[in-house]
Amino acid sequence: MDKPRLQAAAKNVRLKASLPGTERAISIAFAQYGPRDVAFVSMETGLKTFDVTDLDKPKLLDHLTKEEMALPGDDPTKRFWENEDINVDPKRKLAFLAREVNSFGRALPGDRPTGNYIVSAVDPADLKILSFHRQNTGHTSTCINDCQFLWTAGLDRSDAKTGRIFVTDIRDPKTPKELPVSVDVRGKAGEGKITHDVQVDAQGIAWVAGDDGTRGYYTQGWHRDPLSGKYREAKAWDPVAYAGGGVPKADMPTSFTHNSFRPIGRTLDDGPRPTRENPAGSLLLHTEEAFGSPTCKTEGRFVISSLQGTHNGEGWGEKPKEMKTVGIWSPDDQEGTIPGNVTCSAHYFDVQKRIVAYSWYNQGTRFLDISNPAKPIQIGYWRPDTATSWAPYWHRNTVFVADISRGVEILELEKGAYDAQASGTNVTLTEHHARELARESDREPVPLAPNPFYGWACPMVANRDDSDCGVGACGAPC
């Protein structure tokens, strides 16, 4: 059955601008250059930089092309994949691009290099590759300890085949050095469990998402190690367990977390209001990426968990403790949601002033008020024609959305969204299921398929015989 072409739907959100030439955008980061704001857009075609100081007139600065990124043996006509969560060193002006196993048409039985490109963006209008560091994974890479180290997550392609984080010393970005350690090991050798991504909170805790839940680590300073009972110094290559664990199956059936956010310190006001029941720093917001119903009715949802009772190592070991679920949300039965043969899962999100901007693939970008963590409410949504919303990013009271079908769109919330937040009003139709009808359109959503290595835990654009993604360009057969 073909995917329906989706009728556009939006409420309390308006389109401010678009970044030209950003179709197949995957992830975005920002950096300050004096008075200038620069956006880094990672795409299947490489890396683009834009001057977005004037949001009404964004200006392309440079394009590091996939042809420039191609390694010996690559087919440069095929796509770069995936760098799902680009990181930028704001001080040294370095960009980090994680390379997956199926980039540039690589397939078995041939060699399939994975690892990280380190790109100099000292001049954002003149991007230069400093190095490519090959290692046995390459899905996402995250700056640790002021970008002196990288934690890289993904499928472990070494003989161990355990879920783990790879640690790279990038103090010299021209000669990165992988350290002989395994961080956040998940499962036994050969089980094929994975880590997926790392987010660092405002306290410096590094949160690792993947199979069996989300766990946090100190990477600096002296702390009591709950796994040994001893006080020791935390390091990027030898972190100290902090808190976290699994999620009840009823709330997250796959037990696979995709990304997370813990509001604390300077970001505390971005998260739910602290209460006696849920004090400051005790909540963890995270995504289950899973594809069940077209409306995410029972899986692939947004989950808010309590970290209380997990600070003594309870979330580690063969049977990690499950965190208490505080709240859950999905687009099911929400205004702006379309039924039928469409792709739905929670994906990346970003938080500002208690509002979550959230990507849900074909169900678009949703805006949720999380003031009450037990009851998130939808205050606006943006589900344009052919939406395949990948990741949203708050930037100066606007939201940049990386949509792999439409490119990067810059959105603004309208007054109605803030009024709904102030009054606690959910923009849900109560008389009947608030769903939009499919109709014919001039545009068609990008087809998605399960990743040959991660399955539906991390889908990819399906093989298509066209100029953007030719037959075989998307990796192994799905």
Predicted regions and their residues:
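Feature marking well-ordered beta-strand scaffolds used for ligand recognition
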Residues: 1-461
